């Protein structure tokens, strides 16, 4: 990570958060062949809306998602479907240039070198991607069992809690920390004490 500088910004509202992070993404997209890591969930929705509204050039950009359920990628609740709906189908990124964690995880690790910008969200129990509290800081991309709290939190995206996948493939904390720049987005009072 460049310079290891920790900067905390408290913003007025959720939409300002999306705009501020969109500024960082827009700057990153000016690099010759930018590589980004992107999150899912409710927190980055304002970011994705703002990025679509800015009509930026994504044609040389490669993206990697932090995680994906162990689920058919075309399932309506997969993160692949989420990202297509929120961003990829609405900007000029080539389908061959966006990637989700896959098995074998070692092959995915080989693809994700030299990340320019990694955007993260944080779960209500402090998980980053699907790295639950207590995950090793050296962890790599791997298949994980989801905690009961994470399954419960994510049930809002499914018709019932029984439909929430019990496993996911996630980038590890060690993998994430190799990014040149990291931005952690957090929104809401429930994230204040994490």
Annotate each PLM feature:
Residues 38-43, 120-124, 187:
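Glycine-rich beta-strand-to-loop/alpha-helix junction loops that act as flexible
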Residues 25, 31-54:
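Glycine-rich N-terminal segment of FAD-binding domains in flavoprotein oxidoreductases
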Residues 174, 178-194:
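ATP/nucleoside-binding phosphotransfer catalytic cores, i.e., glycine-rich phosphate-binding loops
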Residues 2-5, 58-119:
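Ligand-binding beta-strand-loop-alpha-helix segment within the catalytic cores
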Residues 113-138:
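Glycine-rich phosphate-binding loop
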Residues 129-173:
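Class I SAM-dependent methyltransferase SAM-binding "motif I" and its flanking Rossmann-like core
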Residues 48, 59-67, 71-74, 128-132, ...:
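Active-site histidine-anchored catalytic micro-motif
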Residues 1-36:
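N-terminal glycine-/serine-/threonine-rich phosphate-binding loop
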């Amino acid at each position: 990570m460049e310079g290891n500088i920790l900067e905390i910004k408290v913003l007025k509202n959720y939409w300002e958060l999306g705009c501020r992070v969109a500024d960082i993404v827009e700057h990153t997209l000016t690099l010759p062949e930018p590589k980004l890591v992107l999150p899912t969930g409710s927190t980055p929705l304002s970011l994705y809306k703002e990025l679509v509204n800015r009509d930026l050039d994504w044609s040389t950009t490669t993206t990697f998602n932090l995680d994906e359920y162990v689920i058919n990628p075309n399932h309506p609740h997969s993160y692949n479907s989420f990202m297509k709906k929120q961003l990829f189908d609405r900007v000029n990124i080539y389908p061959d240039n966006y990637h989700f964690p896959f098995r074998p995880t070692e092959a995915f690790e080989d693809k994700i070198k030299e990340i320019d910008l990694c955007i993260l969200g944080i779960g209500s129990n402090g998980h980053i991607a699907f790295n639950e509290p207590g995950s090793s800081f050296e962890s790599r991309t791997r298949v994980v069992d989801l905690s009961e709290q994470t399954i419960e939190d994510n049930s809002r995206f499914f018709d019932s809690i029984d439909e929430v996948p019990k496993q996911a493939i996630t980038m590890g904390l060690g993998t994430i920390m190799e990014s040149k720049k990291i931005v952690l987005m957090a929104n809401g009072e429930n994230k204040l004490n994490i």
